[in-house]
Amino acid sequence: MSTDNKQSLPSITLAAIGVVYGDIGTSPLYTLRECLSGQFGFGVERDAVFGFLSLIFWLLIFVVSIKYLTFVMRADNAGEGGILTLMSLAGRNTSARTTSMLVIMGLIGGSFFYGEVVITPAISVMSAIEGLEIVAPQLDTWIVPLSIIVLTLLFMIQKHGTGMVGKLFAPIMLTWFLILAVLGLRSIIANPEVLHALNPVWAVRFFLEYKTVSFIALGAVVLSITGVEALYADMGHFGKFPIRLAWFTVVLPSLVLNYFGQGALLLKHPEAIKNPFFLLAPDWALIPLLILAALATVIASQAVISGVFSLTRQAVRLGYLSPMRIIHTSEMESGQIYIPFVNWLLYFAVVVVIVSFEHSSNLAAAYGIAVTGTMVLTSILSTTVARKNWHWNKYFVALILIAFLCVDIPLFSANLDKLLSGGWLPLSLGLIMFTIMTTWKSERFRLLRRMHEHGNSLEAMIASLEKSPPVRVPGTAVYMSRALSVIPFALLHNLKHNKVLHERVILLTLRTEDAPYVHNVRRVQIEQLSPTFWRVVASYGWRETPNVEEVFHRCGLEGLSCRMMETSFFMSHESLIVGKRPWYLRLRGKLYLLLQRNALRAPDQFEIPPNRVIELGTQVEI
């Protein structure tokens, strides 16, 4: 849903509730339970309950309301958000060295997201299914199988798209938040003393009383704000104002009421710590609440899956991941996509995590490191944008950065304590993704530079061919060209082996702009290089899919008539060999070869009919 959509504000706000707030909205299922479960050396004590509630409330205010909704969401690229967008914006007005550092930060943040998405569906669905322990304790052995069944169904429907099912997301999540509020308010009315925890003094007293342990306990408190990056990442779908409106009118009040309601329950009944969320409900409401919780966590998982599809497409289009098959599941909404490879790889990883960790409490130990790491990087990148792009006063920006890091760094440091008990998982997955992205980008650059160095000058070659033309054959030939100033290898090899040229030769370059969309007026640029040579440059945004047939249509409007089924497409297929390098660079080269062999072929990327494609091979040493 783009920001220029003509839907009414209430409908867009409702849709935002259904998609954006799924992850953070299901955090009450497990957050307070993990805070007070006894793992930090203290149980359900009054000061501890007040301290944790105060910390949760002020984190929701400072991190979500102030940092993300007020500050970070100001940084948009044509309305789009996300960590890679922030990386792109931050690097626009900086030196080459600074830009490289910012790119690394952005890629680390994106990699952290990949590490976290494996945990989110598992912990969300398992925490909901664990309500069975309250309803029927004898069914606790079914928690893992049922969680896998629910997620299997979710991943299976991805290829069909979520357009129809997605219409139910908003009313279900709105119902979820209203139930959160009602359950919490009911408990608060019975014990209003808990509202004293709104005073930040209780958070300060918590640190003073529990000292070192209180710092480590921040690793559990951060569970209340997991999913905060989704607010920024989904900005392009719904717009800033609907997301902010949904937070302040529905989501924030519901979360606060439920957390404080759980706290009020625990003050009266400390034994409810085994599952304070479900024990808020009366006995007759447990089964309906269990079903609603399962639906809410499935929706939260769907939002994460859609997010990883979007991030992958953006990384592919920006050249950080190898091309892969991307299927559009909706003719109306460009954001609804399905990536089979990513879908089933993620499913396999989630199932392995569920089977390995067995309980959401065990998974909570793995949750948080990647989230807080991304928060630190977002603070640095967003304040860089404020200074370099918005030209804010450097001292004011420095104060903002210090304020953000004073919260982010302690949260990240506290989560490092989880490293051995599960935190290694998202970090390991993130490291793998970072290695893959940097390998593809750097080795691809090395390959293109190598081909450019050994290529022939375009202008000189065309002048030579026009002066001493080879045999011409009827028709149009399109040569896919990566570099504007160099003759494509496929053209050189065609001349070398076939010794002919077509009557019309088009050098076609498809490039990705640093923007989500490119206006149709700027889509195609045509330049006639000689009586028989044309250069066509087609520009696309990173949210768009290149389509050669569309390019031909645009060319026809500009006076260069082309017919797909009467055109031959010549492409070079590089056979790569790794040259002499240090051992670690050889390993990176081998990884690149593996990625390239499994990458989507160019004809499939650009939707070119296979029977119109001629591939000419060339060997390149990298």
UniProtKB/Swiss-Prot annotation:
GO cellular component: plasma membrane
Keywords: Cell inner membrane, Cell membrane, Ion transport, Membrane, Potassium, Potassium transport, Symport, Transmembrane, Transmembrane helix, Transport
GO molecular function terms noted in the UniProt entry: potassium ion transmembrane transporter activity; symporter activity
UniProt xrefs under Pfam families: K_trans, K_trans_C
InterPro entries, per the entry: K+_transporter, K_trans_C, K_trans_N, Kup
Tagged with keyword Transport: yes
Catalytic activity: K(+)(in) + H(+)(in) = K(+)(out) + H(+)(out)
Membrane topology: Multi-pass membrane protein
Main location: membrane
Membrane spanning stretches: 12-32, 49-69, 103-123, 137-157, 165-185, 213-233, 247-267, 276-296, 337-357, 363-383, 396-416, 419-439
Cell compartments where the protein resides: Cell inner membrane
Highest rank taxon of the organism: Bacteria
PANTHER family, sorted: LOW AFFINITY POTASSIUM TRANSPORT SYSTEM PROTEIN KUP, OSMOTIC STRESS POTASSIUM TRANSPORTER
Family to which this protein belongs: Belongs to the HAK/KUP transporter (TC 2.A.72) family.
Listed HAMAP family: Kup
Functional description taken from the UniProt entry: Responsible for the low-affinity transport of potassium into the cell. Likely operates as a K(+):H(+) symporter.
Name listed for the protein in its UniProt record: Low affinity potassium transport system protein Kup
Lineage, uppermost ranks: Bacteria, Pseudomonadati, Pseudomonadota, Gammaproteobacteria, Enterobacterales
Gene name linked to the record: kup
